[in-house]
């Protein structure tokens, strides 16, 4: 009789689970059954790495445990039978922190902390197998872990400190000179001799102290009896040997290892009953045999095991290319778990996509052993398997590779990005004395290029055009790339890449303060890195329901019918809720415009939909998987209406969300200024949108209380705004609603309006059902529902003199607002207010048009219109430079608006170090010398080009108006401990840590005697949204005001008690001295001689960026970055440098790999999954990354300990410099090839766009 259970171990504790649902993932089991919530859910697609855990198995051949990192969000629980599961909680805790966690926590290697457990686990898997890893091994281990906050540098630096290679963070430093940070730079840099951290002081890593492999798993005697697992929809059989498999497979509708099959099945909402059989535990399918002549790899083995076997068993020149190919093909987490068989079958089934492994298996002339339905074994060539679709009637048992293969293997994979991406085209060639095989993949099945193989010997003598003609392939562009690279390979077979030196530098001026100004690690780092930090979806509520979101599938239509009957039939579904269930206002954003811009977004669609992804209603169910399934069963019928999805068509149709906004001079005055100029230039710019890609998706938990009370736990950037939104929606006074935010897993502007809508939906359901209600968006739903950065189309006409000095400019900008207002009018306004950037442009006019389209309603995103203005102006400056024959940097410099001068709307420029930053950066980066070197490089390089560019930023702080204030509440307990609460939310920017340091400095109390509690409306209310880079400034002023008031009461008592704090507090209590207070913080502009609409001070900076592009593939890489910023006297240099680096990488992504497009016909977002939207990876971090804080103290009294805000300014600078640097690369190629037409700002400069611009038409 079959068994019904599985046995495994989690963090040292044995677990027996009976009748596991085959559809249950390891992540949901760990989080919801075992309460191990350090395993985060960021995408549930195996893309982001936040859910990474480690699986250990005992290898009898090696007599040791082998560990591998996997995506717990994909792994079915039944796959962990006889496995040691290790989560971040099992690695270490705050009481006994692991060295990996310790170095990352104290090394400032996290910001919001949501992705951090995943990085720890990826590193832990590597170190468990290789205690002395190389830098290349570390890079490979974390290459599929995504981080949106840090810019990766501190993560890499912390992990590189474990490297066995000399040089630590400078691994690859072949001089033996040690770490760049151990060298004092005081001689050349005048006092910038501090380093954020030296890992030399940390304890050495001791692998013998790791948790041991559980003896229970080693001695466990697994029965030969097959296991049967019965879930709600699936009965799964797990046979143990091939005879059992043959016996039972006839009765099973699905044959699979179970990984991808489970992933696909859970996305099928229908009720069904299926019988599966898994190859996972079939002995013969898990065997590896290495003979003298062949290598046999079992069908149930994972991709990495297959690759490792081939790498070690085939000739070195073939093996090393297989290893390199697999790293580009897949993430470690996927390769460590997905079977090579699944990849082969998926490729063989597809008539459209390109299969990487099929290409590899074809070029290696692999043979497959197949099992037919009669139980007979047969052997076929891989080509025959794919061509005859034998997967429909046969099961793969193993693959056989000949060990007699000789020569060199060459593989090329082309996608949107250079690694771990879907493939558009691939090419593989095996070239040797005996065997020459070449295959190409371009949609559908691999094609053998036999006609090209006969030309191998003559490769050096044939031109690429000649070779292309022999391929009989229509895709000339990709074939040309492949053959060019192949030709290079043939001529340099023995060449190996040198490890590049790594140069990470962070300079700041140290301060002698006890707290403020010191690079102290964020107090919550240890909590996050050990999995102990809770985010909204980690909070556990009794008897809760979860929401599944019913979304529009058409861009514009009337809703004629909503049928929820099939969804409500599912057991565990509590109900459907839509617009008729809203007790108050369905458009609450129109009623609370005093805290935000008026927003006509509906909570639920009312009679019509205006975008794909608009929320029509929600399903409430007992668990989130069921809720999402049920939501997909809701049938919505539409009467479709004309739609405007395409942005340019909407502009032509004059479809607007609001009034046209005009700033600057009268149109006639600008026209006159241009007519009087020596020359007028004009151009057009197109700037794409950007997704926030916070790792924690939108999350809310609303708990109903007595009466009308609601406790709203929400991942929001504005607790008071969310409170008012919920109050207006629920028709409940705000004082009965408490909104609490502990921390956000990233925000970037995307968790203001968006977060509040989700909270309102949860509140409606919680009140109706009187049950706690979770609203936790899947990544796909988050991408579909929420807004992005505004796409912009702009035109300009600029008048200049013969030197390139701007005398007047007229901007027109159209912003894609989407289907509702959201923040579109605000972003348009900020573009208009700040369009002069860092320049004095004479007579200026800006006309802004917020455009309505039937697409996502776009919203705030880091920079809030400023990055778009920056990119427009980069194009303007390049255009002028080209026309007058000067460098773009010269044109920028002569057009700077200087301190003491005025912005174009009349505000005076106060406390500004723009020129100092620019000149320092130019010298520090050796800009002019490197320009000469790049010129020589480009002269000698045909396809690969380099460029260098500088950009700068000026960002006025704090902002004028009601948003430019902070609020804080301070109370002192009788034991002397201090509790602080502020109106700003912590979302990775280090706001809470800075406020602790400010409070510590002001009270002269040790920082560990102060705690900062949740941002909550019952402690501080009416607080502005957190954003705009000003919250340390404004909330810092509020904290100082609280401390000043408290100390004015306490100081006489403290003096009387000779400074004894605890005794003084008790005495003050007895004397009825108030030990708590709440204060606002704002800059009294008149007091400092600053106008009401002027900025009291400016955060400024400059950067130089050197880029490289491959004009054939379109791929780019950052060679070196030099950033110089003035943030006054930094409150915490580590946090500020972290913000600078993170903003730089986010800005790099904006102008390179991050793309937002919509299907013109269906209105659907093309990048509608985590895998389709590309954010920068750790491999994109420049190897030479230098940041310097000037530390200029010209404080005017309006600053908190002479500091200035940070957050957004580096992003504007980054996107400008990266874009211009790439354009310099492109211009060089175009000039060399006789193409002289000017290319205005186009963003993003994706691989496809670079290829397009670097091609002869």
Curated annotation (Swiss-Prot):
The active site is at 1208 (proton acceptor). Binds 2 [2Fe-2S] clusters per subunit. [2Fe-2S] cluster binds at residues 43, 48, 51, 73. Residues 229-459 form the FAD-binding PCMH-type domain. Its EC number is 1.2.3.1. The keyword Cytoplasm does not apply. Keywords: 2Fe-2S, Iron, Iron-sulfur, Metal-binding, NAD, Oxidoreductase. PROSITE patterns: 2FE2S_FER_1, FAD_PCMH. GO terms for molecular function: 2 iron, 2 sulfur cluster binding; aldehyde oxidase activity; FAD binding; iron ion binding; oxidoreductase activity. It comes from the Eukaryota. Its cofactor is [2Fe-2S] cluster; FAD; Mo-molybdopterin. It catalyses: an aldehyde + O2 + H2O = a carboxylate + H2O2 + H(+). PANTHER family: XANTHINE DEHYDROGENASE, XANTHINE DEHYDROGENASE-RELATED. This is Probable aldehyde oxidase gad-3.
